[in-house]
């Protein structure tokens, strides 16, 4: 068991006025980190106009681990996301914290996608974060947290790849579920007659062999 500070340094993100946003270089925003445990360049939709110096100061590299810095509730503070792809001229928002290995990263990137979202790490995150009007964490707080991992990167990668495969399966079934819900919604409109008396008392779609108007009762 090791403290996070043994391997990672943390940096606060970029703060700019709203007129700088909308075009420019990609930026890792709060919602990107909050909703995804792993990030690839094509997932980043936010853009910000910056100088070369600012891009250098707030650059994003493959393997960087981000944490949401603030939240409305304490249970949603410090959600993690790791950079899985190779970003180009990409920066990160002031609403997230960037963790980066000081030298050689002891953890596989796929493994990092999950190790900072385990129940034990989440519990520690909640305990060591502050709560006033909003929940808040910091690089200083995260560096004091403990993390456990196998020394073998091969084992780490197998764990990460296995869990990623489950996530992919869940996402596939979720898409199928969403499609079924939309299909059901469409059939509800087609297979039931309208209660509007000005419309025909017939559904637009019926099973073969059934005829006649539907009864309209008050």
Model-derived regions, located:
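A short glycine-rich beta-alpha junction/loop motif
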Residues: 15, 89-95, 122, 129-155
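Short, ligand-facing micro-motifs at secondary-structure edges
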Residues: 34-46, 65-93, 110-114, 123-127
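Non-catalytic DNA-recognition/assembly elements of restriction-modification systems
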Residues: 1-14, 206-218
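Short acidic/His/Gly/Ser-rich catalytic and metal-binding motifs that mark active-site loops
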Residues: 35-40, 136-138, 198-200
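Amphipathic alpha-helical segments with low aromatic content
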Residues: 145, 152-217
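Short, well-ordered beta-strand elements within core beta-sheets of diverse protein domains
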Residues: 51-52, 97-103, 144-148, 205-210
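Sequence-specific dsDNA recognition surfaces
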Residues: 5-17, 32-65
């Amino acid at each position: 068991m090791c403290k996070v500070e043994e391997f990672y340094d943390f940096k606060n993100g970029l703060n700019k006025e709203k007129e700088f946003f909308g075009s420019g270089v990609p930026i890792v925003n709060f919602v990107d980190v909050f909703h995804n445990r792993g990030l690839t360049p094509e997932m980043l939709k936010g853009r910000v106009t910056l100088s070369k110096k600012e891009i250098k100061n707030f650059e994003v590299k493959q393997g960087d681990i981000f944490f949401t810095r603030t939240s409305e509730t304490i249970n949603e503070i410090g959600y993690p996301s790791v950079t899985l792809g190779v970003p180009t001229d990409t920066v990160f928002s002031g609403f997230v914290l960037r963790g980066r290995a000081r030298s050689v990263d002891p953890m596989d990137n796929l493994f990092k996608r999950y190790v900072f979202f385990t129940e034990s790490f989440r519990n520690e995150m909640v305990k060591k974060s502050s709560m006033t009007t909003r929940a808040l964490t910091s690089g200083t707080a995260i560096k004091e947290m403990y993390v456990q991992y196998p020394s073998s990167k091969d084992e780490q990668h197998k764990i990460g790849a296995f869990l990623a495969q489950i996530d992919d399966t869940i996402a596939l079934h979720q898409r199928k579920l969403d499609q079924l819900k939309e299909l059901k919604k469409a059939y509800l409109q087609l297979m039931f007659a309208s209660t509007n008396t000005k419309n025909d008392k017939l559904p637009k779609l019926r099973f073969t062999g059934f005829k006649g108007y539907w009864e309209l009762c008050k």
